[in-house]
Amino acid sequence: MELNGLISLNLSRNLLTRRITSEISLLESLNSLDLSKNQLCGGIPSSISRINSLSFLSLSNNNLSGEIPTGSQLNTFNATSYEVNPSLCGFPLPNKCLGEEMTWNSVENRGNEHVGIQE
């Protein structure tokens, strides 16, 4: 079965488990993808950024983890597309991933010695 012309895919609330396949990018005509409110795990495949026609994305309320991929269409979605995935990080979510630029704040000054924490 070929799904090349598929424009909208809504599989929300289906108790789906496992990972999102990288082959999702083969759905090049997809405008809307809703996989919310399932039990999907693992990372979001970077190949999803190759779906240039994507104008709606909801991956919220799953168990996704890792850094949100960046690129073309993915940069246009806000945090609601990814919310309630506690182990997901990166733009546009407020929680940064390990390895992202961190800053030091001085929390205590003992003479010339600074003790800091990372944000």
Show the residue positions of the predicted features.
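Membrane-proximal ectodomain caps of single-pass cell-surface receptors
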Residues: M1-E119
